[in-house]
Structures are given as structure tokens and as C-alpha cells.
């Protein structure tokens, strides 16, 4: 599940996080969809920016479905040499865009007019925030790794007012944990 908003959207990704956590997750009408969704990516295709706060309010984020609350996580690709384009993205075997398919998709969405706009041309680049998170998390090898090892189901029981309450939670590993697990796997 990928949702991309326009850059500088009203409220940034914080607005989308509130909408998901306060309206969609608690709504029983969305439950069957949420239950089958393992990975969700939200982006307004902007660089991470906390606007003077601690947590970023714009950028590209990921989470997994949850019954009550799903925290949005940042994803930063490993780039130990601080290169302009992280090595994983620079070396990824991207396919060429088929011009006819591109035109057909734009026609299907009645968006042919955007084809030659500067913003559209910029967004085709491999180093945009949305493309970076999609490449980093949805490349076949990494997506399978995340689905197999990166999602944990936790059943918690606690006493509330003398009664035992049980809650089921689903958590997804943070990007730092993923890189650590991949490094361990490579060493084994």
C-alpha cells in the first residue's frame, strides 16, 4: 500500500498519520483491508523536515497496519560515505521507462498535461524521497526479508480495573534494525 501526496500538502504527513490512526484503523469498515496489509508507505515526496521540532512532519514514511496506532517510521538508506546518491540506489538495476506505457498510464488517469512539467520530470529521478523509499523497501530481496523477518506479532495481557485485557499488536522493524539484521546475515 503506497500513498503519495502532493508536496507541501496541508498538514504534511502528520495529517495522514492522524487520519490513519484516528479514523481508518479504528473503523471496522477498513478492518479486512487493514488486516491483509503488511507494509504501508506514505510520502509527500519531500525531504525529511521536522520544521524546528523533533519528529519529521514531511518526507517518506513506512508503517505496518495496527489495530489502534501505527507509528510512522523514517527510512534512511545506508550511505556511510555520505555520497549524493546512496550506493544502494546508485547501483540498483532500474529499468528504462517505456514511453508508450507511461503515456497510457497518464491517459488512464487523465493526467497527460503533466507529462512535460518540470515537477513531473524531477519526480522521475531515482533520488526523489518517494523513489528512494520504494527502492529501499520494495526491491524484491528486501521486501521478502521485511515480510519474513521484519514484522512481529505481539499479544499483550494486562490487568485493568481487576480484569485481564488482551491486545494484539503488530510491529515493523526500524530501518536501523533491518540494516543490522542484513549485516549479520551477510556475516553468517
Regions found by a protein language model. Name each.
Residues 1-188:
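ATP-dependent helicase/translocase motor core
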Amino acid at each position: 500500500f503506497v500513498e503519495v501526496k502532493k508536496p507541501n500538502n496541508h498538514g504534511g504527513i502528520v495529517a495522514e498519520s492522524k487520519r490513519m490512526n484516528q479514523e481508518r484503523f479504528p473503523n471496522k469498515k477498513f478492518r479486512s483491508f487493514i488486516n491483509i496489509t503488511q507494509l504501508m508507505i506514505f510520502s509527500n515526496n519531500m525531504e525529511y523536515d521536522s520544521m524546528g521540532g523533533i519528529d519529521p512532519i514531511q518526507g517518506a514514511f513506512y508503517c505496518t497496519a495496527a489495530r489502534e496506532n501505527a507509528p510512522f517510521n523514517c527510512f534512511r538508506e545506508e550511505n556511510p560515505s555520505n555520497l549524493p546518491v546512496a550506493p544502494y540506489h546508485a547501483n540498483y538495476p532500474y529499468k528504462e521507462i517505456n514511453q508508450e506505457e507511461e503515456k497510457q498510464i497518464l491517459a488512464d488517469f487523465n493526467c497527460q498535461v503533466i507529462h512535460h512539467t518540470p515537477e513531473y520530470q524531477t519526480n522521475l529521478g531515482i533520488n526523489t524521497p518517494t523513489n528512494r523509499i520504494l527502492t529501499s523497501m520494495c526491491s524484491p530481496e528486501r521486501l521478502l526479508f521485511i515480510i519474513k523477518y521484519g514484522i512481529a506479532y505481539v499479544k499483550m495481557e494486562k490487568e485493568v480495573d481487576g480484569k485481564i485485557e488482551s491486545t494484539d499488536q503488530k510491529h515493523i522493524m526500524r530501518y536501523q534494525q533491518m540494516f543490522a539484521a542484513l549485516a549479520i546475515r551477510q556475516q553468517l
